[in-house]
From Swiss-Prot:
Species, as recorded: Bacillus subtilis (strain 168)
Source organism, top-level taxon: Bacteria
Localization, UniProt: Cytoplasm
GO BP terms, alphabetized: phosphoenolpyruvate-dependent sugar phosphotransferase system; polysaccharide transport
Molecular function terms, GO-annotated: kinase activity; protein-phosphocysteine-sugar phosphotransferase activity
Protein name: PTS system oligo-beta-mannoside-specific EIIA component
Modified residues (Phosphohistidine): H83
Principal location listed in the UniProt entry: cytoplasm
Keywords (A to Z) from UniProt: Cytoplasm, Kinase, Phosphoprotein, Phosphotransferase system, Polysaccharide transport, Sugar transport, Transferase, Transport
Ranges where the PTS EIIA type-3 domain occurs: 9-107
Pfam families: PTS_IIA
Record function comment: The phosphoenolpyruvate-dependent sugar phosphotransferase system (sugar PTS), a major carbohydrate active transport system, catalyzes the phosphorylation of incoming sugar substrates concomitantly with their translocation across the cell membrane. The enzyme II GmuABC PTS system is involved in the transport of oligo-glucomannans such as cellobiose or mannobiose.
InterPro entries tied to this protein: PTS_IIA_lac/cel, PTS_IIA_lac/cel_sf
Length: 110
């Protein structure tokens, strides 16, 4: 996935990009668990990998935001940004939990 540059985006567009990528990742994570339940283990792994790509894109955007702010350009706080941050962080937690669950299922042949 190509890295998006946030330099020409508004704060709202940046927030929506975070929501977009973390939302896509969240969907893949849930689909992964469902695929595993249906016995489609390879598909489950592929969906986790796809989720990680979207989370990587979100992380890149987030990192650019931090770099921008550390360079003296303040980020405007908004409810939308807070929602985007919450969405990203909860999706990261969900990914780690589901990966651990899938590993457990595999080791126990569930």
């Amino acid at each position: 996935m190509e890295q998006m540059k946030i330099t020409n985006l508004t704060d709202e567009q940046i927030s929506f990009q975070l929501i977009l990528h973390s939302g896509n990742a969240r969907s893949c994570i849930i689909q992964s668990l469902r695929a595993y339940k249906e016995g489609k283990k390879d598909e489950a792994d592929a969906l986790i990998a796809k989720a990680e790509q979207d989370l990587s894109a979100a992380h890149d955007i987030h990192f650019q935001m931090i770099q921008k702010e550390s360079g003296g350009e303040a980020t405007a706080f908004s409810l939308l940004l807070m929602h985007a941050e919450d969405h990203l962080m909860s999706t990261l937690s969900m990914k780690e939990l589901v990966k651990e669950m899938l590993d457990l299922f595999k080791t126990k042949n569930i």
